């Protein structure tokens, strides 16, 4: 599986490995999660 780059939308409930950085964090303004 390809990982998502920084700033990409990710699932807050998904595995951290979905992001290349290994961190999926809440967006400060939008009510979404993004890769750190």
Curated annotation (Swiss-Prot):
Disulfide bonds: 3-20, 10-24, 19-35
Entry GO MF terms: serine-type endopeptidase inhibitor activity
Keyword match Transmembrane helix: no
Matching InterPro entries: Tryp_inh (IPR040875)
Site for Reactive bond for trypsin, residues: 31-32
Keywords: Disulfide bond, Knottin, Protease inhibitor, Serine protease inhibitor
Residue stretches in coiled coil: none
Keyword Amino-acid biosynthesis: no
Domain of life, per lineage: Eukaryota
Domain observations: The presence of a 'disulfide through disulfide knot' structurally defines this protein as a knottin.
Function of the protein: Trypsin inhibitor.
Family in the record: Belongs to the Mirabilis serine proteinase inhibitor family.
Protein name: Trypsin inhibitor 2
Organism: Spinacia oleracea
Classification lineage: Eukaryota, Viridiplantae, Streptophyta, Embryophyta, Tracheophyta
């Amino acid at each position: 599986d390809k990982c998502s780059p920084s700033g990409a939308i990710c699932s807050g409930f998904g595995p951290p490995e979905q992001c290349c950085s290994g961190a999926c964090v809440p967006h400060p303004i939008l009510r979404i999660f993004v890769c750190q």
